[in-house]
Amino acid sequence: MIVKTKKILIDSKLECSSGEALESFELMTDFYGELNEKKDNAVLVCHAFSGSHHAAGKRGDSVGWWDEFIGPDKTIDTNRFFVASVNNLGSCFGSSGPLSEDKNGEKFNNDFPQLEIIDWVESQKMLADKLGIEKWHLVIGGSLGGMQSLQWAVSYPKMVKKVGILAAAAKTSSQNIALNEVEREVIKKDGDFHDGKYLEFNKSPVKGLKAARMLGHITYLSAKNMDQRFGRKLQSTDSKIAEDVNFEIENYLQYKGGKFAELFDANSYILLTKVMDKFDIAQGYEDNLEAVLENVSAEMLVVSFTSDWMFPASNGKEICLASIKANKKCSYIELEGEYGHDSFLYPNEGYQNALKNFIESK
């Protein structure tokens, strides 16, 4: 598989929904496969909340977050398709964000423009223009990436042939907004946060970020999977992360939260949770989802998982039902999924076959 990683400069102004603007910006992007002469085999893969451009392939000890799905003869066959995977603006894996420098050569910190999903789509559209891609064969993503896919179908109906919306929703629920607010507050209460200017003090609020991620990670799992995997098993003494840990599930969350805090940026975390909170595709349409979808021309596939309590199956059904009422072509698949919200990330023969058939159908 041909893999290229590039940091691409978009030397044009991005007017953000907040009223702020970026005069130029960079998008860290992975490319898999080759773009054909007609440039009609392009696929855009949108990552979830804390994901990155590294969707496939192995780099050192790191394997792409959708490696089982992208590659030669895989679900998204790179013998046929050219895949672009973009690190979202505001994230911390190479694209412009709080860790980047502003026009004065200073780190943005928490002064990076507040973004919305529609801004991400606009930045990706500018990338497509630069690549000479007039129409994506497919835009696909899970969770926050699925929301981007839906926004693409609405914002640029003539630029998308197919859309895959996985474990996502048309708007963020009040429950998710509440959880995100708690996570933000935990980060801000860390003594090393310094009102978001921690880099100026050579600090990082790792304790707060760790705790926030531990809370967030619980929402990605399912009660059934947690019971099957951990139950009430006690953690062995020789592998305890902390002295006061008793159960395996505690140790697991301590480990996951700690590793995450080593890799992620707290200001990005806060910014991205707000991006999620602000998403409501029917805002400005009197909450009429059917009306929003009137101009969509892409064929849609919506996949939900019954074990997902972050974006439950009812969210996916809502999107597909509104699409059908708007006389759009939409298929809906509901799977149990072993891993709760994260089920969209894991290989499953029936799930992958459904995606592959959708992607390759004419």
Where are these regions (language model features)?
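Cap/lid segment of the alpha/beta-hydrolase catalytic domain
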Residues: 63, 74-128, 177, 181-199
